[in-house]
């Protein structure tokens, strides 16, 4: 993962989704990465295109890379992914110095034939130095200008733009400085806007790239756009932490891609379609915060409510989406003091919210929308597992979920999509196995190979598709329960040892039947002490109980070991003898039930968040400044009374007298 050639999978996937969508109606496509690195961008585009085209065999890949070892990695990765060598064209060279025309060596000028493709994708090195000398007439740069020699970002961008066909598309990762830096870059940016080439700008989260915290964007460019707007997306807030870096989640990628596809006028705090006239008004500055404000509202304090109490209507209005969804709830929870402030009039806020008819109706509507979704999934995934198109099935299911959520307020459809994607990862693997190896693969078990002392050895078995734990919980629950009971008893014995240790005196803990750390009994020494009969009766009673525990523990450990081995071996046999119907039931439990459980939890998550926000607003002004002042006064009076009872020498009493003055006493 060297930073100079590694593009995070999620960024690569995002760019690929945009490109694949643009090229979805084409029978064959050619794609080119002029700074190919490991080849991940090209590989992901092939996968995404397969969803629309039915096969990635209709894709021809072009790649150019400066560093020889990385160039070799590109070709190797493409071949290892099953891509035909006939569909791979790679070059080892400097993209900016050695453009990719085809020509005959003996007549390069008259036989010049530049490469034009359907899509160019790239993640070039950021702000790299280059040599613009004598390149003014180069066809890649002549219409737009030359990037400054200290920053080649726009040189790479113009190279990419030049190499697409008139109906092609470019996606390129760049440092965000290209959006607003002046000089030669400002000129190029102006020309790109005037030529109507910039289709979209996507601001990425900070620290998303390995080894650098440079803020980055993805710019989408086209040659023959029909509209002159630029879609600006601020995706900087959607991510999860992954060690020291930030990582786009599946829901973040889909939210961005959907915004690109739909090109909305505005999505609050996320995206906006910006006219060319507005960009010109801003002197061609494309800095994202000029067009999309994704900042969170700063918390403020209402001075009136802080002094006199009450809940400001203005702050309740911040929850307007909930009041719209639950039109009668607000009146049931609050009574007005005046036109601007109100009081909470229920004792238990959470119960009042959850039991209100509007909220009950909301949960019922969700249940109705997804009431038959389990059956829908069973029909699609279980009944149709051998014939469905696994590459496009997740997208089809996401459309179904979005359609069911269309009339359900408050539930974030992208949160639902994330649940689907989390589940889909295991489903997709299983489907690939079943479709390529046959349904019999579901009844297969494989040797569980582990590494021991630098050698691979077998340690039991694993289900090829069906996990042992799942099969045991469904088909062998009595045996599992018996084994778990013994394991539980072993845990209890460990706790009993600790209790008996606590009962010993410090003198007893110095005896040989307790170890040097004084945190465990020594089994052999316990037996000796019992036999010697040289301890107090109370201690003897403890030692006999401990000795009995040692015996019970030894027996249980052997039973657990033997039972576990027997259960494991029997599970292997159960999987191999499953009927087809039993397999389908187990797949339903593995694939569908967890997804349904997670989806059905979404309304509760919405309501929990609502109650949490509402409770915070109500408690914010529970104690007024007047209450605080009264508490301070009461405390001062109490302290004055205590001071009156104090006695001391002359100097102590003078000090106490002065303190009483400060506290408002005589």
Across the structure, where does each feature detected by a protein language model lie?
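Helix-turn-helix-type domain boundary/helix-start signal
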Residues: 4-5, 64, 246, 576
């Amino acid at each position: 993962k060297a930073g100079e050639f590694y593009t995070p999978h999620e960024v690569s996937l995002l760019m690929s989704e945009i490109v694949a969508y643009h090229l979805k109606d084409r029978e064959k496509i050619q794609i080119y990465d002029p700074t190919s690195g490991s080849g991940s961008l090209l590989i992901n585009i092939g996968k995404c295109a397969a969803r629309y085209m039915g096969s990635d065999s209709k894709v021809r890949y072009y790649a150019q890379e400066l560093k020889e070892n990385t160039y070799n990695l590109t070709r190797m990765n493409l071949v290892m992914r099953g891509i035909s060598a006939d569909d791979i064209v790679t070059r080892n060279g400097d993209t900016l110095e050695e453009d990719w025309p085809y020509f005959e060596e003996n007549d390069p000028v008259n036989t010049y034939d530049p490469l034009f493709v359907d899509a160019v994708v790239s993640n070039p090195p950021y702000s790299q130095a280059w040599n613009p000398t004598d390149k003014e007439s180069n066809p890649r740069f002549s219409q737009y200008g030359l990037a400054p020699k200290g920053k080649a970002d726009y040189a790479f961008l113009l190279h990419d733009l030049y190499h697409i066909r008139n109906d092609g598309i470019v996606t390129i990762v760049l440092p965000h400085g290209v959006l607003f830096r002046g000089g030669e870059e400002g000129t190029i940016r102006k020309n790109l806007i005037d030529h109507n080439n910039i289709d979209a700008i996507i601001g990425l989260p900070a620290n998303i790239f390995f080894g650098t915290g440079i803020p980055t964007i993805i710019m989408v460019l086209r040659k023959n756009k029909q509209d002159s707007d630029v879609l600006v997306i601020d995706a900087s807030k959607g991510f999860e932490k992954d060690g020291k870096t930030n990582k786009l989640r599946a829901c973040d990628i889909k939210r961005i891609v959907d915004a690109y596809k739909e090109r909305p006028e505005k999505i609050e705090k996320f995206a906006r379609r910006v006219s060319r006239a507005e960009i010109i008004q801003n002197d061609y500055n494309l800095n994202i915060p000029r067009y999309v404000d994704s900042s969170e509202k700063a918390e403020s304090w209402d001075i009136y409510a802080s002094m006199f109490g009450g809940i400001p209507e203005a702050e309740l209005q911040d929850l307007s989406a909930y009041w719209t969804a639950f039109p009668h709830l607000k009146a049931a929870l609050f009574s007005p003091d005046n036109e601007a402030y109100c009081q909470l009039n229920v004792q238990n806020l959470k119960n009042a919210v959850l039991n209100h008819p509007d909220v009950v109706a909301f949960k019922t509507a969700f249940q109705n929308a997804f009431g038959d979704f389990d059956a829908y999934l069973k029909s699609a995934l279980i009944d149709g597992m051998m014939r469905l198109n696994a590459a496009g099935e997740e997208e089809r299911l996401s459309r179904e979920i979005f359609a069911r959520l269309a009339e359900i307020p408050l539930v974030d459809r992208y949160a639902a999509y994330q649940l689907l994607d989390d589940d889909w990862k295991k489903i997709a693997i299983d489907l690939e196995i079943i479709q390529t190896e046959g349904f019999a693969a579901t009844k297969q078990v494989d040797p569980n190979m582990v590494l021991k002392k630098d050698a691979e050895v077998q340690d039991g078995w694993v289900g090829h598709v069906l996990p042992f734990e799942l099969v045991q919980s469904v088909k062998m629950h009595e045996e599992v329960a018996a084994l778990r009971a013994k394991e539980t008893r072993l845990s209890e014995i460990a706790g009993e040892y600790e209790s008996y240790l606590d009962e010993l005196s410090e003198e007893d803990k110095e005896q040989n039947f307790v170890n040097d750390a004084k945190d465990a009994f020594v089994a052999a020494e316990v037996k000796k002490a019992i036999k010697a009969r040289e301890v107090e009766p109370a201690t003897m009673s403890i030692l006999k109980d401990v000795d009995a525990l040692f015996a019970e523990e030894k027996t249980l450990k052997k039973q657990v070991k033997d039972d576990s081995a027997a259960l494991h071996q029997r599970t292997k046999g159960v999987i191999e003898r499953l009927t087809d119907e039993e397999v389908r039931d187990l797949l339903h439990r593995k694939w569908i039930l967890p997804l349904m459980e997670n989806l059905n939890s979404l309304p509760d998550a919405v309501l929990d968040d609502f109650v949490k926000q509402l409770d915070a607003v109500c408690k914010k002004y529970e104690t007024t400044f007047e209450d605080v002042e009264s508490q301070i006064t009461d405390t001062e009076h109490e302290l004055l009374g205590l001071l009156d009872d104090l006695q001391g020498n002359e100097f102590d009493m003078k000090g106490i007298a002065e303190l009483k003055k400060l506290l408002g006493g005589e």
